[in-house]
């Protein structure tokens, strides 16, 4: 008996017939060959596109600096930081490389009288500048008042950060003397005073991992009185 009457929906207009999924052997060979060719060609083209270009040759530039009172004529790679120029070219290794990211202050030097993290600036940006490093502040026979104060108050332990601490301290007293306010300066009209809060705020960019901060503060306060007198 026919079931056509029981399932009239099978005769609806527009009902799709099943697709013919049969595949001849010839068609299978064609598809396999095309797939294999794609697998061979595509990785090679991707590899060729990913090969980096040759690194350009470094650009060398003449540079004149006045470092610790002495004029230096240099030829430096334009990508070289001031820190590396001081240490590698001029062998002034008193300036330390700490974090190399401008976060610790160990590389602080004075550039035209203002403190600067030498690891964050390119040497060629300071053509003709006057640079003072820890070696230029004083000598063993004639210490700068700040150097003498750090020794007197034991403002260090391992000593790695000390050159940056001292250079920054000298600049801090100069900033206060020049009337430059800080974030903790209460009266912006009057000249800032050399208070403990002012010193702590201004020295906050110089990290001492040994924790000699109390002695560093005492040294700066002592040197401030010595320099004023």
From Swiss-Prot:
GO cellular component, alphabetical, reads: outer membrane-bounded periplasmic space; oxidoreductase complex; periplasmic space
**Would I find Iron-sulfur among this entry's keywords?**
yes
Q: Which reaction does it catalyse?
A: an aldehyde + A + H2O = a carboxylate + AH2 + H(+)
Comp. bias regions, Basic and acidic residues:
9-21
Cofactor remark from the record: Binds 2 [2Fe-2S] clusters.
Q: What is its EC number?
A: 1.2.99.6
Signal sequence coordinates? 1-53
Modification after translation (UniProt): Exported by the Tat system. The position of the signal peptide cleavage has not been experimentally proven.
InterPro entries xref list: 2Fe-2S-bd, 2Fe-2S-bd_dom_sf, 2Fe-2S_ferredoxin-like_sf, 2Fe-2S_ferredoxin-type, 2Fe2S_fd_BS, Aldehyde_Oxdr_Iron-Sulfur, Beta-grasp_dom_sf, TAT_signal
| Alphabetical list of NCBIfam families matching this protein | PRK11433.1
For this entry, the protein name equals Aldehyde oxidoreductase iron-sulfur-binding subunit PaoA
In which organism is this protein found?
Answer: Escherichia coli (strain K12)
